[in-house]
């Protein structure tokens, strides 16, 4: 069986919570697009976990999790998130987390360009997060 959770409200509609609830019955959980500008908190018997890049299935033993081709991955953030999960007793290994070779990697200069754009706007922000991946995401048509 295939279950898809698709947001149509530009975020903040509870997709992460639904994935957490439904992932109990899944062998594979795929996050197909986005970056660490999104996030949700999961509280379970292992503790409280804040997820930005990781699919919610990472909290389930025996579940394979995939960061898909539409993902924008900030490696520094991903490594930090993985380490926090490991400290909480969650297994983050090559067996539990797969990364598409078509995912986009956020480089330090992308963040710098995003900060420079904010400066150019002279404080007139237009709703982006402080993760500084907007510049990179604007360069690609992610599908």
Where are these regions (language model features)?
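Non-transmembrane, aqueous-exposed alpha-helical and coiled segments at domain scale
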Residues: 1-131
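Single conserved hydrophobic/aromatic residue that forms the stacking wall/gate
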Residues: 131-143
